[in-house]
């Protein structure tokens, strides 16, 4: 394969070869008289262009997504140490994640609007550089300024929002059909993988550096690397180029028109509500399950309560490893199962999500039944429950790509993120901590009651997961109609502007 490169002769290309442009379209070969030997700078430029392939772009974007979630959950890996240093309770500790998610979801619609209209890779890189700088600076906050740590997490949420809102749409414009499902599966594998690595990184960096501050000084360095790679190796694909090979969608609708269309898209609305249920559970679990398991071991007399820093990182490490493995299994099983089920029914995507959600709720309920007697049993239930829960991440994104036209996808991803965070993990960590604190204040404080109160608060999660399964079943009812409607609109938008009639 040869790459077009400003008339510079590329090694291995002849005058009869077809030349691939960066957008993936084919152009006639350059004639011999148009070719000349490359100067050193042109050779480097030509080599750089050859590296800008869709697979390389998807790999770099997936790496950046891993870092996004790794940074998000690094704080959770050292949460007990933060509580001891700043002397805050469960509700105040949960506030760290809540303000992060609140700023994340408020910024998401703004970045969605920008992502449908401006250069996406520039926005992505700036977002990564911003949150990396803020995270690094937050590692120097002293114990008198807990409010400043809370503010820093708020700012980090804004930076990470740009990435989550825009990067899936680039992959959507690089691939289509089953190949897009596979690439989105790899991309969304970053959610559990990055979350698990966040716990592990936080624990290891704290132990190596002797203080929890060091947990916040690793991901920024990796973030700067990811931002630079995006600028150099990720090209900006034409919007809709995968859906309409060789061209771009020529008509852009207004933001108001986009929002009206999304509000009328029943598959999009119900799948967004289902995503909110998943976010509610994962947000609460990510913050509180390691704490819950520590308290369970204190009750079983297999561990002592942490009084001084540094606290044991064992449970955060184990939970992080489980999250990584279950994330890998969940995303792979979800992608394979969906491809197989598509041979039986065209509604496979939402139905697989619904079944996995309902199955997950059962095993998550069992965590709180067995934790008092067996930590190993609790870990087994966590493993199965998380695997089933993580099945739907990539499938949900693929549902969106099917039912939303390319020129609205960044806005759709952003508002789906806004909805899932607003109704999900924006409030769940704080709500669980608040319920736990309220139960502890109602009765005499003891180690057994600290364990039970947090468990009772976390029991809210399985019921929310069941509700999410119901929303996926509702999505299945409208999925085919909405998918066909979107395909018809894509064909309309690919025509010359004078012949296009946009459905509002």
Curated annotation (Swiss-Prot):
Gene Ontology molecular function terms on file: sphingolipid transporter activity; transmembrane transporter activity
Superkingdom of this protein's organism: Eukaryota
Pfam hit, one: MFS_1
Gene Ontology terms describing biological process: branching involved in blood vessel morphogenesis; cardioblast migration to the midline involved in heart rudiment formation; embryonic heart tube morphogenesis; embryonic viscerocranium morphogenesis; lipid transport; regulation of cartilage development; regulation of humoral immune response; regulation of T cell migration
GO CC terms: endosome membrane; membrane; plasma membrane
Protein location: Cell membrane; Endosome membrane
Keywords associated with the record: Cell membrane, Endosome, Lipid transport, Membrane, Transmembrane, Transmembrane helix, Transport
Membrane topology: Multi-pass membrane protein
Catalytic activity: sphing-4-enine 1-phosphate(in) = sphing-4-enine 1-phosphate(out); sphinganine 1-phosphate(in) = sphinganine 1-phosphate(out)
Disulphides: none
Disruption phenotype: Disrupted formation of the primitive heart tube.
Residue spans crossing the bilayer: 48-70, 94-114, 122-142, 182-202, 214-234, 269-289, 317-337, 351-371, 375-395, 415-435, 460-480
InterPro entries the record matches: MFS, MFS_dom, MFS_spinster-like, MFS_trans_sf
Its biological purpose: Lipid transporter that specifically mediates export of sphingosine-1-phosphate (sphing-4-enine 1-phosphate, S1P) and sphinganine-1-phosphate, which play critical roles in regulating heart development. Mediates the export of S1P from cells in the extraembryonic yolk syncytial layer (YSL), thereby regulating myocardial precursor migration.
Family membership noted in the UniProt record: Belongs to the major facilitator superfamily. Spinster (TC 2.A.1.49) family.
Protein name: Sphingosine-1-phosphate transporter SPNS2
Organism: Danio rerio (Zebrafish)
């Amino acid at each position: 394969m040869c790459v077009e490169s400003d008339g510079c002769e590329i090694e291995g290309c002849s005058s009869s070869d077809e030349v691939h442009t960066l957008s993936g379209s084919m152009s006639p070969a350059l004639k011999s008289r148009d070719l000349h030997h490359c100067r050193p700078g042109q050779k480097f430029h030509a080599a750089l262009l050859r590296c800008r392939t869709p697979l390389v772009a998807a790999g770099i974007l997936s790496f950046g997504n891993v870092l996004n979630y790794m940074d998000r959950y690094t704080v959770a890996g050292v949460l007990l140490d933060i509580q001891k240093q700043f002397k805050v309770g469960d509700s105040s500790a949960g506030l760290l994640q809540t303000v992060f998610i609140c700023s994340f979801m408020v910024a998401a619609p703004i970045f969605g609007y920008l992502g449908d209209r401006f250069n996406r890779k520039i926005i992505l890189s700036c977002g990564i550089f911003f949150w990396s700088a803020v995270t690094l600076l937050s590692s120097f906050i002293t114990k008198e300024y807990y409010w400043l740590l809370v503010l820093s997490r708020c700012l980090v949420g804004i930076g990470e929002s740009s990435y989550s809102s825009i990067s899936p749409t680039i992959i959507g414009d690089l691939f289509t059909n089953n190949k897009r499902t596979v690439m989105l599966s790899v991309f969304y594998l970053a959610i559990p993988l990055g979350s698990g690595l966040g716990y592990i990184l936080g624990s290891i960096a704290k132990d190596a550096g002797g203080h929890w501050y060091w947990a916040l000084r690793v991901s920024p360095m990796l973030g700067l690397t990811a931002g630079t790679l995006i600028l150099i190796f990720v090209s900006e694909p034409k919007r809709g180029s995968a859906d309409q090979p060789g061209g771009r969608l020529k008509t852009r609708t207004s933001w108001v028109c986009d929002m009206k269309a999304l509000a009328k898209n029943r598959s999009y609305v119900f799948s967004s509500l289902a995503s909110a249920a998943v976010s509610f559970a994962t947000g609460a679990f990510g913050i509180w399950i390691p704490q819950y398991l520590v308290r369970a071991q204190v009750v079983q007399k297999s561990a002592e309560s942490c009084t001084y820093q540094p606290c044991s990182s064992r449970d955060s490490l184990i939970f992080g490893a489980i999250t990584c493995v279950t994330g890998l299994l969940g995303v792979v099983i979800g992608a394979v199962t969906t491809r197989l089920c598509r041979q039986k029914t065209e509604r496979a995507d939402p139905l697989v999500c619904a079944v996995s959600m309902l199955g997950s709720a059962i095993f998550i309920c069992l965590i709180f039944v067995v934790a008092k007697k067996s930590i190993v049993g609790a870990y087994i239930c966590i493993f199965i429950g998380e695997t089933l829960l993580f099945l739907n991440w990539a499938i949900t994104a693929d549902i969106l790509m099917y039912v939303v036209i390319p020129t609205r996808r960044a806005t759709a991803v952003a508002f789906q993120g806004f909805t899932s965070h607003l109704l999900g993990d924006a409030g769940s960590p704080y709500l669980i901590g608040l319920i736990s604190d309220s139960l502890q204040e109602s009765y005499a404080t003891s180690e057994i009651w600290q364990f039970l109160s947090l468990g009772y608060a976390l029991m809210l999660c399985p019921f929310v997961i069941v509700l999410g399964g119901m929303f996926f079943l509702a999505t299945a009812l409208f999925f085919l109609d909405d998918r066909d409607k979107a395909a018809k609109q894509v064909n309309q938008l690919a025509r010359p502007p004078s012949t296009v009639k946009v459905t509002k």
